[in-house]
Amino acid sequence: MTDDFRWIDAPQGRLYAQRWPRPADGAATPPAPILMLHDSLGCVALWREFPAELARATGRDVIAYDRAGFGRSAPAQAPLPADFIAAEARDSLPALQRGFGFAGFVALGHSVGGAMATACAAAQPEHCQALVTISAQAFVEARTLAGIRAAREAFARPDQFERLARHHGERARWVLDAWIDTWLDPAFAGWTLDATLAQVRCPALVLHGEHDEYGSPRHPARIVEGLAGPARMMLLPGCAHVPHREAKPAVLEALHGFLGAPAR
């Protein structure tokens, strides 16, 4: 299996993207790929081995990309625009479809990437075959803000900030400030995912850690309640904000079942 690295021209600049091909099975028509959208401090590299394992578990190509300003992609404007969640569906998704030559897709996102995946599903209901959210926020909760404030204190330590800089280089400060300043801004306090959820008709799997430090189980419950299509919530016991690392076997098993891949 050979990974496929590409530079994608998008309205916000060049995006770094990578594809992990599905195992060869001789199928004449391959299933729609899974498009992965990372969290507020994430990038392609921070998915680690999960995309390759996901491709094997589901029998689908997996595509992940660095949003503008993150990882290896072009720098982004500061601060984040007010519509930064919807912008991924409007600008990045069509560019990735052109760059990799796909139309139909499965949207999968972690944390704020889950909100962006939901926006992609809402923007292209004719193409999005399924939605998966992992630890996604549906509104601004006191626990979310407390978790971000605690992270701000943690990243004040040089060793913690250096870990972020390993993946984002000289843009690490922008990445951190964009996350903290956006979510702690009083103007963002009324944000919800409700209107977007109501436009999603495809099947959805909503995964959430029982002890997520950035969001209570009220978030996945609200997501499932707000979606227009069939949805299932899976609360992962003992997990915090990163279930695909903390409970990887359970997450892969759930995704294998949800996306209907044949046993391998």
Residue ranges of predicted features:
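Conserved HGGG/HGGXW glycine-rich cap/lid loop of the alpha/beta-hydrolase fold
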Residues: 20-75
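Short beta-strand/loop motif that positions the catalytic acidic residue
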Residues: 200, 206-208
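Short alpha-helix in the alpha/beta-hydrolase fold that links the catalytic acid
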Residues: 202, 216-225
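Active-site loop/oxyanion-hole signature of alpha/beta-hydrolase fold enzymes
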Residues: 64-105
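Alpha/beta-hydrolase fold catalytic core
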Residues: 1-35, 59-60, 260-264
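Acidic catalytic loop of the alpha/beta-hydrolase fold
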Residues: 211-215
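Flexible "cap/lid" loop of the alpha/beta hydrolase fold
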Residues: 118-123, 127-159
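Catalytic histidine-centered segment of alpha/beta-hydrolase-like enzymes
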Residues: 239-252
